[in-house]
Amino acid sequence: LPTYAQIGIWAPILLVFLRLLQGLSAGGEIGGSAVYLTEHAGSSSRGFKTSFLQLMGPLGILVSTLQIALLQSWLSPEEFLSWGWRVPFWISLILLILAFKVRMALEETPIFLQLSQSDTQSKTPLRDNFRDPETRKRMFLLFFCISAGGAVLFFCVQVYTSIFLKTAVKLPPQLVDQLSVYATLALLPLTIFAGWLSDKIGRKPVVVTGLVLGATLILPAFHLLQEIGQTATYSAGFTFAIAGILIGLSAILALVVGPQTALLAELFPTKTRNSAATLPHNLAAGWIGGLLPLIVTWLNQHWESTVAGLWYPTIFLASSAVVALLYLPETNQVNLTK
């Protein structure tokens, strides 16, 4: 993009516009991807097969972290700030072409084709979703418990840990990036395991366990990170201790997001499944996950503490756990053709 010095106020306007376009593209695909994968996955291993979709976010963070680390090691600080930061965006053009080709080659799911042939498709799915009391209730459960809970945990585990270790604990940025890579690498198989486990014992117990553990352990984990970080020995034992806490937090996140893809589709009837899953999921990511950094930062500043803001996600996760325990239905044996 042109810089502010080159085109003035149009530089940030163009950046915001492209970010909005990116958000619309990603938001429009996530629900459809979840439905598409779940309807193709079969009935006995939906949680396991669809959990691979949840790896894309952590993988994106992992790849981008490695890209930045490599560029910063190859380039001077001036070169990186001048043009080096643009390289990952150039590389993403290759992914865009590949994704477009794959997208164009995909065929509709057998369930959707059967629905099309029977002429029972909903012509106004969004309106039908809000007219049906059971669908409305399940959209709220998806929004509040599953999607918002996952967004809150994702922020705490994948985003705020790095910020906290760099700014509050004052660890070297290179060490924090290294620790973040360890945690993300651990998150990948843990997410798949959580999806598999939800096939065996049910989606609800796995998700509720993750929400409860998140509500009870987020604050103690960050307090412990701060205490260990104050030793500042940077020994192998020090690194192992910090990495262990981060991997433990990753395991909690995995319990919520592992079954999430299957749940997005299983909660709703075939004829309105895509819109019913997509709307609450994206609203939760935007409203709850998107505003979380702002709220946590404000609370930290207001209470003059580095961890006070984490009471907000703690209370939110506890509330989500209670609502999910009382009202979230078990769906791992649901018939997706209905």
Regions found by a protein language model. Give the residues of each.
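Glycine-rich segments within core transmembrane alpha-helices of 12-TM secondary carriers
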Residues: 48-72, 95, 280-292
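A late C-terminal transmembrane helix in Major Facilitator Superfamily
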Residues: 271-303
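C-terminal ends and interior cores of transmembrane alpha-helices
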Residues: 1-8, 212-234
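Hydrophobic core of transmembrane alpha-helices in multi-pass small-molecule transporters
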Residues: 4-27, 233-255
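Extracytoplasmic gate region of multi-pass secondary transporters
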Residues: 135-187, 288-293
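Helix-loop-helix hairpin linking two adjacent transmembrane segments in secondary transporters
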Residues: 57-103
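Cytoplasmic membrane-interface "Motif A"-like loop-to-helix N-cap segments
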Residues: 200-211
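Flexible cytoplasmic inter-helical loops of multi-pass small-molecule transporters
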Residues: 104-125, 334-338
